[in-house]
């Protein structure tokens, strides 16, 4: 049976759920798909059950595995690709590696428990990796006391304000993912209200459609008889079947012979789309996660760059001791993981909680440009987050 082609009828956004473990992120994600799937005869959304999201296959990301579930759904005005990361470690790794470039996020907070350590950590991480818009779902509101829920809402707004999200303006919607899954009309309506808030509060991002095509490689697959496929989110520009592209890091120039999103063929992919690209005549072992597929000649790989970096405090899960010149951590840039030497120049020491300027010399060439965000990792934890200010 031939596959149905992907038809772009609505603007596309990438969204994700975040929040403390057991506050109901996965249940709410399942409820969103169920409510939208049952909206009427014209619904294009398919219901995805809790178990299917919760048992999402592991995705290998440079030596670390991430459990991440991808679902898609449509509201009246938009098409969403939604990621749910069931475990806390999965969320941290995902945000740090940029495996999911989110245009906005739904922060799920239990009305019974309020803010927990992971709630605050997820908000901090979202801010660092450039998620500019958050909508709050106060979950389990069916079981909570109204006065207590009011207090939790106040707490959440204060937390968001502290991290630069303008907590007073952020939509906070009281929901019950569980009751919505059970079909309770009141709580089904609450999920619809949440989606309305996402539709109206999270703006359409600038997608850089006019810029040269660039896609950071997240995964590489082989389709028997057809060739090598790379998957990832298009960072900027557009790509069509037949376009010439180069794989930076593999020094290969080739042609895109196939294009799919969520298993549906498409003629053209644009910035923000999650896609699979079939590349002509490229051997499976020449391409790997961390490389970049781009319009030929549009990006020059480099090793040295200057950056502004925030060093996480011990309270945020970072180091308890300062960094000095000569420090050699792992740099997570787009989907690449590269060791690098740090030179702090005149600053000499960077204490946990400081924001500093540093020069970095990477162990190998990586496509770099001003404004690119990255994370610094050491011993399996994030110790810093920064932005490239100059490429040398």
Swiss-Prot record:
Region (G2): 63-67
Ranges where the record places region G3: 84-87
Keywords: Cytoplasm, Elongation factor, GTP-binding, Hydrolase, Magnesium, Metal-binding, Nucleotide-binding, Protein biosynthesis
Region (G1): 19-26
Span list, region G5: 176-178
Transferase as UniProt keyword: no
EC assignment: 3.6.5.3
An annotated Gene Ontology molecular function: GTP binding
Keyword Glycosyltransferase: no
UniProt superkingdom: Bacteria
Binding site for Mg(2+): 26
Residue stretches making up the tr-type G domain: 10-206
Main location: cytoplasm
Transmembrane domains' residue ranges: none
Catalytic activity entry: GTP + H2O = GDP + phosphate + H(+)
GO BP terms in the entry: translational elongation
Any one cellular-component term (Gene Ontology): cytoplasm
Pfam hit, one: GTP_EFTU_D3
InterPro entries reported in the protein's UniProt record: EF-Tu_GTP-bd, EF-Tu_GTPase, EFTu-like_2, EFTU_2, G_TR_CS, P-loop_NTPase, Small_GTP-bd, T_Tr_GTP-bd_dom
Cellular compartments annotated: Cytoplasm
Binding-site positions, GTP: 19-26, 84-88, 139-142
Function (record text): GTP hydrolase that promotes the GTP-dependent binding of aminoacyl-tRNA to the A-site of ribosomes during protein biosynthesis.
Record note on quaternary structure: Monomer.
PANTHER family per UniProt: ELONGATION FACTOR TU, MITOCHONDRIAL, ELONGATION FACTOR TU-RELATED
Family the entry assigns: Belongs to the TRAFAC class translation factor GTPase superfamily. Classic translation factor GTPase family. EF-Tu/EF-1A subfamily.
Protein name, as recorded: Elongation factor Tu-3
Native organism: Streptomyces coelicolor (strain ATCC BAA-471 / A3(2) / M145)
Taxonomic path: Bacteria, Bacillati, Actinomycetota, Actinomycetes, Kitasatosporales
């Amino acid at each position: 049976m031939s596959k149905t082609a992907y038809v772009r009828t609505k603007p596309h956004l990438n969204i994700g759920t975040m929040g403390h473990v057991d506050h109901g992120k996965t249940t709410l994600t399942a409820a969103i798909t169920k409510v939208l799937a049952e909206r009427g005869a014209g619904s294009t959304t398919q219901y995805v059950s809790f178990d299917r999201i919760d048992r999402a296959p592991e995705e290998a990301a440079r030596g670390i595995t991430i459990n991440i579930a991808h679902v898609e759904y449509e509201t009246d005005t938009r098409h969403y690709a939604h990621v749910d990361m069931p475990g806390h470690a999965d969320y941290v790794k995902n945000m740090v590696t940029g495996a999911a470039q989110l245009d906005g996020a739904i922060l799920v907070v239990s009305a019974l428990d309020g803010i927990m350590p992971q709630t605050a950590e997820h908000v901090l991480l979202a801010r660092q990796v450039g998620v500019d818009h958050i909508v709050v779902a106060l979950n389990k509101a069916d079981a909570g006391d109204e006065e207590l829920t009011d207090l939790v809402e106040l707490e959440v707004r204060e937390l968001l304000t502290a991290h630069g999200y303008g907590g007073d303006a952020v939509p906070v919607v009281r929901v019950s993912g569980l009751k919505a899954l059970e079909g309770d009309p009141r709580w089904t309506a609450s999920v619809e209200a949440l989606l309305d808030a996402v539709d109206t509060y999270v703006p359409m991002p600038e997608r850089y459609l006019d810029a040269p095509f660039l896609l950071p490689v997240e995964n590489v697959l082989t389709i028997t008889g057809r060739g090598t496929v790379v998957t990832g989110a298009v960072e900027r520009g557009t790509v069509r079947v037949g376009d010439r592209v180069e794989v930076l890091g593999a020094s290969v120039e080739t042609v895109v012979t196939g294009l799919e999103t969520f298993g549906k063929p498409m003629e053209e992919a644009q910035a923000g789309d999650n896609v699979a690209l079939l590349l002509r005549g490229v051997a499976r072992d020449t391409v790997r996660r961390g490389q970049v597929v781009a319009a030929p000649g549009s990006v020059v790989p480099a090793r040295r760059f200057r950056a502004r970096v925030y060093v996480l405090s011990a309270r945020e899960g970072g180091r308890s001791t300062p960094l000095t010149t000569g420090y050699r951590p792992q740099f997570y840039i787009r989907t690449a993981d590269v060791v690098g030497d740090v030179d702090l120049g005149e600053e000499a020491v960077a204490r946990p909680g400081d924001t500093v300027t540093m020069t970095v010399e990477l162990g190998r060439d990586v496509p770099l440009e001003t404004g690119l965000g990255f994370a610094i990792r050491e011993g399996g934890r994030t110790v810093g987050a920064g932005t490239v200010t100059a490429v040398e």
